[in-house]
């Protein structure tokens, strides 16, 4: 398996700590006039990231209290449920996010934070059976997904 490449971005200095996981939500209107906005907004909207390390560089920021801090990040794996027949380690899948039964106990794992509709992921590990049953009666497996 290929090693995950890290990249440098800027996040709020008060948030910056190793291990922090976050979902990038996109650029804010307040960022339009910022001279370092490209460094802050160099991530993919909806993706989940994890901070590996913090750099000493801090920039003034109209969005974040105490400025924006340079951090090294990687895309973070997501844990979710997929159809059992797709749960094969190292396979590439397109997660099915079509279920609308939000009252189902499995719904949050069928729609994990950081999984973007229409994008492909690699099943990095099959973790086991679904912790709860599916209201639609589907056979599901709990897996770890990595963006590709």
From Swiss-Prot:
Q: Which Pfam families match?
A: UPF0179
Source organism superkingdom: Archaea
Give the signal peptide as a residue range, or say none if absent.
Answer: none
Q: Which InterPro entries match?
A: UPF0179 (IPR005369)
Spell out the family assignment given in the record's similarity comment. Answer: Belongs to the UPF0179 family.
Q: In its UniProt entry, what is this protein called?
A: UPF0179 protein Mpal_0949
According to its UniProt entry, this protein's organism is Methanosphaerula palustris (strain ATCC BAA-1556 / DSM 19958 / E1-9c)
Q: What is the lineage of its organism?
A: Archaea, Methanobacteriati, Methanobacteriota, Stenosarchaea group, Methanomicrobia
